Amino acid sequence: GDDGIAVAMALAVLDDESLPHPPIEAVITVDEETGMDGAMGIDVSGLKGRRMLNIDSEDEGVFTVSCAGGARMDCVLPVRREAFAAPVQRITVQGLVGGHSGTEIDKGRGNGVQLMGRVLASVAEETELRLVEVCGGLKDNAIPTGAQALISANAEVTAEVCRRMTQSLREEYRVTDPDVEVTVEPAETAMLPMDAVSTRRAVCLLVCHPNGVQVMSADIPGLVQTSLNLSLIHISEPTRLRCIS
């Protein structure tokens, strides 16, 4: 990828004594994809150079004159739990294409975590729903390809809503995600469901969380200036729902 190409180019220049150039310092850091932890922790006091070339293109000989900034938001929602007399079921949203949250956020592809919120909201419109657990996403820089949720609700109503949601989402995402699917099956869990208030708050978080392109560049046609990706959600402990974007 782009990081490996950059390291190879820097090492090749350092290794070739026939190339004319001013003094060069090569700075190589780790964890660029998952939060730039290496760059954040580097001690620059020993560097003498005052100009930096950021080699972050995927083609040899191409230099990108820019710098992409990013911030990670970690949101924790406290939840309460109580018993609820309805069967437990597992809802799965799957079949999405996904992609890189930086280079492919403008493709209009479905976000599995946010679509799960829409499914849960649709179930809640037709029957009493209690959320037990929800999880989705693999990396904070990847568009989620799916999500799963354990719920307590009327089984027949839930099955019908999931069937309709599959049809609706396949029509909505027929170009970008034609294989999207919503399934439901019986499940078991020892965890109590969230209460009504916590369920509503959790579903609202998934549905209303900003996601996708927010602002396009006014200077460069087709360039995304600001975007958000609802990348990860899970129960970090029984009384805490955590999402990352």
Question: Where are these predicted regions, by residue range?
Answer:
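Short beta-strand elements
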Residues: 75-79, 89-93, 228-232
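Single conserved hydrophobic/aromatic residue that forms the stacking wall/gate
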Residues: 233-245
